[in-house]
């Protein structure tokens, strides 16, 4: 087993071990994706912390943020599309958000079977506080990465995210 130097991290050790077991395999993708997965795990924890500081859960932020960015009321169908969750889950989430006074629902006058959802002033306060704290925490997490490297990383991740349709 390789010995960790001061610059080695868990991914370096993983790559070293696999390169000994499979020397003919280019492990560059594993190196990149393992670091990306670890970064995503840390980002998930940052998001939960930021949202908790504003008194909302991650799922609440997701719905409230869509409404906040829209700047107007949206149909439940539009919220389902934007958040990529099912209709039963959305109904449950909207019930809970309405109970907490974070959204208001009303019948859609042009379609009696549908509802329109609007974010309340309390919902705006919560989602704005959560976003402000999230950006602060993310900036702190990126403090050792130069602006130039952040731009390169964002560019590379944009390409990677667009590649989600290139499944093997």
How does the language model describe each region?
Residues 95-155:
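Charged, amphipathic alpha-helical coiled-coil/dimerization segments
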Residues 37, 65-71, 158:
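Short, locally clustered residues in the helix-turn-helix/winged-helix DNA-binding domain
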Residues 151-168:
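Exposed, interaction-prone assembly regions rather than primary DNA-binding/catalytic cores
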Residues 65, 92, 155:
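DNA-binding alpha-helical recognition surfaces that contact promoter or target DNA
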Residues 30-33, 37, 41, 84, ...:
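Short amphipathic alpha-helical segments with heptad-repeat character
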Residues 60-64:
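Short alpha-helical "packing" element that flanks the helix-turn-helix/winged-helix DNA-binding module
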Residues 1-54:
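N-terminal leader segment of winged-helix/HTH proteins
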Residues 57-58, 71-116:
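Canonical helix-turn-helix DNA-binding module
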């Amino acid at each position: 087993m390789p010995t960790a130097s001061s610059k080695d991290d868990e991914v370096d050790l993983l790559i070293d071990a696999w390169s000994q077991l499979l020397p003919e395999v280019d492990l560059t993708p594993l190196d990149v994706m393992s670091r990306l997965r670890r970064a995503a795990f840390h980002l998930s924890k940052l998001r939960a912390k930021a949202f908790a500081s504003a008194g909302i859960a991650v799922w609440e932020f997701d719905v409230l943020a869509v409404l906040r960015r829209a700047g107007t009321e949206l149909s439940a169908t539009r919220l389902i599309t934007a958040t990529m969750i099912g209709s039963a889950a959305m109904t449950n989430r909207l019930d809970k958000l309405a109970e907490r006074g974070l959204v208001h629902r009303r019948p859609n006058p042009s379609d009696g079977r549908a509802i329109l959802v609007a974010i309340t002033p309390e919902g705006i306060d919560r989602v704005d506080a959560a976003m402000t704290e999230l950006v602060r925490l993310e900036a702190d997490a990126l403090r050792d990465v130069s602006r130039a490297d952040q731009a390169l990383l964002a560019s590379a991740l944009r390409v990677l995210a667009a590649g989600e349709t290139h499944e093997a």
